[in-house]
Amino acid sequence: MIIIDRFEEGFAICEKDGMELIKISRDLLPETAKEGDVVVAFGDGYIIDSDATEKRRKTVEDKFFGLFN
């Protein structure tokens, strides 16, 4: 799984498989890509995996709100 962590100087700094950070050229990502999106390789670039992104956001949100219960 590749998750966009942040953008720096024309690159997306991404977490790959929870183990390492990789740099992906911003040109290879959809214009709508943002921090926290899960992306997968597709052709010569990457696409956003909307289902995985939403599932991940929900998990993070549940953990966050669980801290206050």
Describe the role of every protein-language-model region:
Residues 42-48:
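Short, charged beta-turn/beta-strand-edge "cap" motif at the junction between a beta-strand
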Residues 1-7:
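Structural detector for short beta-strands of small beta-barrel domains
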Residues 16-24:
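Short, structured beta-strand/loop micro-motifs enriched in basic residues and often containing a Trp
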Residues 10-13:
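Short aromatic-glycine-enriched beta-strand elements
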Residues 48-67:
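Short, compositionally biased
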